[in-house]
Amino acid sequence: MSNRTSVLLVAVAALAIRVSPVTAQAPSFEVTVDPATRSTPLTGRLIVVVSKTAQPEPRMIIAPQGPALFAIDLNQLRAGQPAIVDTKSALGYPVPLAQLPAGEYYAQALVDVYERVTRAADGKTLWLPMNDGTQQVMQIAEGNIYSDVQKIQVGKGGTVKLRITKTIPPTPRPQDTEWVKRVRIQSQKLTAFWGRPVYVYATVLLPRGYNDHTSVRYPTVYTFGHNIPFNFTPDSTRVRNIGQINPVTGVETGFDFYKAWVSDTFPRFLAVSFEQATPFFLDSYSVNSASNGPYGDAMVEEIIPSLEKQFRMIGKPYARLAEGASTGGWQTLALQLKYSDFFGGAWVLQPDPIDFRRYQLVDIYTDTNAFVMPNTQLTTTERPFRRTVEGQLTWSLRQMSLFEEALGTKVRSNYQLTGWEAIYGPLDAEGYPKPLWNKLTGTIDRSVANYMKENGYDLREYAQRNWATLGPKVAHKLHFFSGDMDDFYLNLAVYRFEDFLRSTPDGKRVPFTYGRPMKGHSWHAVTWAELVRQMGAHVRQHAPAGEDTKAWWY
């Protein structure tokens, strides 16, 4: 190949990169809800999912790396009335409908159904995807409706007709077992806030000998995840690689943890996980929130006291421990800081941003745009949202924001970025969460950033502001863990939290453990069994004089 030809091809390739392809004749979608499926007017988010494959069903693989989405809001759509999704009406991800490349696809319509709710706390009337407190994404949420999968051809224009005929049924709740008990607790505080019953679900893992040692009370670890604590399972047929440590996560299988849990001379704990979904996200983060309600107060004043009445828990601060990773890591630290006298220890693993000067890679107090960083006087570069442990960019923050906006307007995506806004942020004039940045332009709203700081959601800032009283209470209770190449750049805020603590007398001894090299978001420093052993030793070390710390270690 001649040099001249090479230069020409490079120039053509560069032009192709700069100019997005446009389908000459993009299709439109005419979506109708069968009156037999729903006869009443429908408000919600209609998403037409367009995939290159028929299986799994397109709706079941909705994700940032998944199929194309084309979405519109529905406002009291009458049964049988068609909704039009076209190049003018639809927000598209990852490309506009007009830029969907020609070819063969499989299309499916899904509606995230909204319910009209008047929030008792402020009297605001909202349209929201409600739930009963269990963790349900829109693809499988009870009451949402969808169509069959239909093969389509893109590039020839025309109208694709999709008919919604199916309703997602309730998901059966797991049954209690010998080891695992499930409890539903109504919160009066949250019920008063919403003006309707609100529940928190707890999954309680019993220690070996719980039914035999009837006079023993146990320390409790609250694991802020949504599954059975520590992935516990006595069924060896449900797991692979028994006896091996996962090279990525650093933890054992659920069956190997079960063997440790029931072994001799293992510290006997009760372990509890929670489901506390809100209309805006899969988890409340266990804090009081303008949008979600007083989940923090509910947790420490209602939910945990209720569990302590139902199970033989010691029920004293030294014997209440918190542990969590990612979402759960942020919750764990927030609970230990905001209810410092209630919990006796916090194991904070790869937490969501705990210093908002590193809200992932965004400084929400000084940056003006979340999507880009200046790299010269005249140009900018895209800000990443996720990377591999080798540093390869997988999604940009612009892509993630567009994805969430496609899932739901008015902070109703039920995904991560809008979930944070509903937890940390103020309300807009209508009563919906106020976005931290515009999801299409990236422009940061500094008033929202300042609200988050002033109301204590930037946990480093909150701790620093209150450290004179917090330090002596919590420094000996904190333990931090993070991989050096966290997929979502969460280690950067952990470094800044450590810098603050190292500047204080109380904080100098707080342990920070980092996974190196190339340890990502799911990394753990020790196995689950070893973590519980460390927790047992911590409880013994910090138990007040006169407390029996031998009865539960058998």
How should each PLM-predicted stretch be described?
Residues L9-V10, A24, P305:
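A periodicity- and composition-biased signal for non-globular, repetitive helical segments
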Residues L15-V22:
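C-terminal segment of classical bacterial N-terminal signal peptides
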Residues A36, S51-Y554:
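Non-catalytic cap/lid and distal C-terminal segments of serine-dependent acyl enzymes
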Residues A24-Q55, R184-I185:
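Mature N-terminal segment immediately following signal peptide/propeptide cleavage
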Residues M1-S2, A24:
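Initiator methionine at the very start of the polypeptide chain
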Residues V7-L8, V22, I354:
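Short amphipathic alpha-helical "recognition" segments used for binding
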Residues S2-V10, R18, T125-T134:
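Sec-dependent signal peptide recognition
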Residues V12-A13, A525:
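Alpha-helical and His/Cys-centered functional microenvironments
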